[in-house]
Regions:
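Oxyanion-binding "anion nests"
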Residues: 1-23, 27
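Secretory-pathway/luminal and periplasmic proteins that interact with or process carbohydrate-rich
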Residues: 6-11, 68-76, 263
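Short, surface-exposed loop/turn motifs that are enriched in glycine and acidic residues
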Residues: 24-35, 44, 240-243
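Aromatic-acidic/polar surface patches that form glycan- and anion
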Residues: 27-35, 108-116, 164, 350-354
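Alpha-helical packing segments of well-folded alpha/beta enzyme cores
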Residues: 1, 5, 37, 41, ...
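Short, surface-exposed patches at the edges or C-terminal ends of soluble domains, predominantly
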Residues: 130-367
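A glycine-rich, coil/turn loop motif that links secondary-structure elements
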Residues: 23-31, 56, 190, 196
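CBM-like carbohydrate-recognition segments
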Residues: 30, 39, 47-131
């Protein structure tokens, strides 16, 4: 289909006519809704690897054409999308006969949502394309070994594919939109099976409360991960509150980098009293500046030594840290705070900037 669309693309504007097999014919016009859908499909298809990379240039040329031919600005400075056909179909009363004349007879509408929606999606792809070099060729691996919770026979809780509140689907999209690829590791980590990874994320290791037979962190696995970090790997350690996470064994690994997850937990939240989970980010905070406010509840504190440095405190306690280890780095926090529930702002007020923080952290790890 994409190859066929290239054959009927207007070479001058890069766009598509309302009746695309009759370009330049009297009365025919460049139409916004279809053109914007094709731009979006080409750009995203190439980014995701479904289409050849040559479609990027095709989409960019078409988008430039859309800005030139479809976008206007009124006297008040508001931007509008022009040339979206209001409707198209066959049959009915009055009878729609599918002729050339019929398809040109339907009225055009300014800012019709059928055109605006695809234009927004196409515009987002153009913005995403600017940041793809950040993570190009890099792989982000999410642990599925130490965290292996199932429900009704299905894996869930902090997984890339989980689109419900409990998953990391949105954070995964942020990594992909920075040019990185996603992967998982369902076996014990080794320097060998981590060799192709730029980032390795371990979240909320299982306790017997969550999994019948947990896979515990041990000295051998810690040796392998430490060697990988020293060689240039970037490690994320996200614990959970002490009642919902296996902490003692997890600390076998954390200790290698001067980090220890310790009680008591902070930021208990009652019901929808969101402010009880507020964490304010001081100006100049590494990684997250200029963000001001994020939401994290029931955080496990950190005890730091060696090269580990605190980058955020809460109630006087260290809660977020970074350690430079050899050629790599480690980021640690005592909560899985970037899962869908707390980045999509469907429940939490918009003043909480977890979504933006997730992108900031991804950029830090990929650069």
């Amino acid at each position: 289909l994409s190859a066929a669309l290239l054959k009927i693309q207007d070479p001058a504007s890069g766009l598509w006519y309302q009746v695309p097999n009759f370009p330049g014919r009297k009365g025919n016009y460049l139409e916004a809704s279809a053109s914007n859908m094709f731009i979006y499909a080409f750009a995203k298809g190439a980014r995701k690897g479904y289409l050849p990379s040559s479609y990027v240039a095709t989409a960019q040329k078409a988008y430039a054409g859309a800005l030139k031919h479809f976008i206007t600005t009124d006297a008040a400075g508001f931007i509008h999308l022009e040339k979206t056909v209001s409707v198209g179909g066959l049959g009915g009363t009055p009878y729609r006969d599918g002729s050339y004349e019929y398809y040109l007879s339907e009225p055009l509408r300014q800012d019709d949502l059928k055109g605006v929606g695809p234009f927004i999606l196409a515009s987002l792809e153009m913005e995403i394309a600017k940041e793809l070099p950040i993570g190009k060729g890099k792989k982000v691996v999410l642990d599925y070994f130490f965290n292996h919770e199932t429900k009704n026979g299905q894996r869930f809780h902090y997984t890339w594919e989980d689109r419900k509140d409990s998953g990391f689907h949105l954070w995964g999209i942020q990594f992909e939109q920075l040019g990185a690829s996603l992967d998982t590791l369902s076996v014990s980590p080794t320097h060998e099976n981590l060799k192709g990874a730029s980032v390795y994320i371990i979240v909320d290791p299982d306790s017997p409360k969550e999994t019948a037979k947990p896979n515990y962190m041990n000295a051998k696995a810690a040796d392998e991960i430490e060697a990988w970090v020293k060689a240039g790997g970037n490690l994320i350690l996200l614990a959970n509150d002490t009642t919902n996470c296996e902490i003692p064994q997890f600390n076998i690994l954390a200790h290698r980098f001067g980090i220890e997850f310790v009680a008591p937990n902070l930021n208990f939240v009652q019901g929808k009293n969101w402010e009880q989970g507020a964490v304010y980010i001081p100006a100049g905070t590494p990684i997250f500046s200029p963000l001001k406010k994020i939401y994290i509840k029931e955080i496990t504190q950190l005890k730091l030594s060696k090269t580990a440095k605190s980058i955020l405190k809460l109630q006087g306690a260290d809660v977020m840290a970074v350690a430079q280890v050899g050629k790599g780095k480690v980021y640690a926090l005592g909560d899985p705070w970037l899962y869908n529930e707390y980045v999509n702002n469907r429940r939490t007020p918009l003043e909480f900037e977890n979504f933006q923080a997730g992108k900031k952290l991804a950029e830090f790890l990929l650069k």
